[in-house]
């Protein structure tokens, strides 16, 4: 059980989870732009662009952010 907890705490993989109009982004590098219909951020050498409607920031931590809103497009750009 302790091993599972340590693995969870030490997990550095990027994750993007979208469910029920909630977008949970874990282990991002840097937030670039935050608008009500557009969010962009860096993950290592990639840029993630999220377009949507009524995108509202619900939680902001050093390595995680939670958005609420309808996603209309998601784009990954090599930078």
Predicted features and spans:
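N-terminal intrinsically disordered, cationic/polar leader segments
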Residues: 2-79
């Amino acid at each position: 059980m302790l091993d599972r907890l340590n693995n969870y705490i030490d997990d550095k993989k990027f994750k993007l989870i979208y469910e029920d109009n909630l977008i949970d982004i874990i282990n991002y590098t840097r937030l670039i732009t935050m608008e009500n219909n557009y969010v962009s951020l860096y993950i290592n050498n990639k840029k993630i662009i999220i377009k949507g409607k009524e995108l509202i920031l619900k939680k902001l931590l050093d390595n995680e952010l939670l958005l609420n809103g309808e996603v209309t497009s998601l784009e990954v750009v090599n930078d």
